[in-house]
């Protein structure tokens, strides 16, 4: 009989711990952004990188994706901050200001969706933990 009362209490406590961990993950993810810089005239590969990054980010709905036109003068400060003067892909932590350049990975794997998503997610998971 005593176990009958302890089981619901234990289950409730477990749910609280699990939901708190999920909130911590969401808070961490909300400080991360994925930013793709591009020039005015975009090539097929640049468009494909955008498409694949958006597909990969479906696993992380709290992480925003943004496109920045590197040729637009209003984006000059941001381009300088990231040293992005053409097509490039970055992970950015708004809290720590840490930047991870994924440009080489993106261009190397743009032709293979599965490999791109695997490498992108691996990099993003590592970035989230740092």
Regions found by a protein language model. Give the residues of each.
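Bacterial N-terminal signal peptides
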Residues: 7-17
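Sec/Tat signal peptide C-region and signal peptidase I cleavage site
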Residues: 20-24
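Thiol-based oxidoreductase modules, predominantly thioredoxin-like and allied folds used
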Residues: 62-75
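Structural micro-motif
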Residues: 79-92
